[in-house]
Amino acid sequence: MTEGRRRQFKVGRVVSNKMQKTVVVAVDYLKPHPLYRKIVRRTSKFHAHDEQQCQIGDVVRIGETRPLSKTKRWEVVEIIKRNEEA
């Protein structure tokens, strides 16, 4: 029997919750430009499973999980900070 690898976690903000039980989470990271070596902010978007709890603007922690659909491989583990405006 093989051991599974360690589960990855990412922290990002919810940018869309228009789907049922799915949110889109934007995760920012810094990466150097390949030629000029200036640090540039980049954004990746992940579809994550959510049981109708998150609102747009919430800061959440997402964790890797088994494939739930064609695009969903992440689930919301916890809501770190609620959006005050919503």
Curated annotation (Swiss-Prot):
Alphabetical keyword list: Ribonucleoprotein, Ribosomal protein, RNA-binding, rRNA-binding
Source superkingdom: Bacteria
Keyword hit for rRNA-binding: yes
The keyword Ribosomal protein is assigned to this record: yes
GO molecular function per UniProt: rRNA binding; structural constituent of ribosome
Gene Ontology terms: biological process: translation
Any single Gene Ontology cellular-component annotation: cytosolic small ribosomal subunit
Alphabetized InterPro entries for the sequence: NA-bd_OB-fold (IPR012340), Ribosomal_uS17 (IPR000266), Ribosomal_uS17_bact/chlr (IPR019984), Ribosomal_uS17_CS (IPR019979)
A Pfam family matched in the record: Ribosomal_S17
Family recorded in the similarity comment: Belongs to the universal ribosomal protein uS17 family.
Subunit structure: Part of the 30S ribosomal subunit.
Function: One of the primary rRNA binding proteins, it binds specifically to the 5'-end of 16S ribosomal RNA.
Protein name per UniProt: Small ribosomal subunit protein uS17
Gene name, Swiss-Prot/TrEMBL: rpsQ
